[in-house]
From Swiss-Prot:
GO biological process, one term: defense response
Tissue localization of expression: Expressed by the skin dorsal glands.
Main subcellular location: secreted
GO CC, any one term: extracellular region
Role description: Caeridins show neither neuropeptide activity nor antibiotic activity.
Cell compartments where the protein resides: Secreted
Phylogenetic lineage: Eukaryota, Metazoa, Chordata, Craniata, Vertebrata
Residue numbers bearing the Leucine amide modification: L12
Keyword Secreted among record annotations: yes
Keywords: Amidation, Amphibian defense peptide, Secreted
The protein's name in its UniProt record: Caeridin-1.4
Length: 12
């Protein structure tokens, strides 16, 4: 997600 960084970072 937007705050995930490790998972998406870009909202993906």
């Amino acid at each position: 997600g937007l705050l995930d960084g490790l998972l998406g970072g870009l909202g993906l």
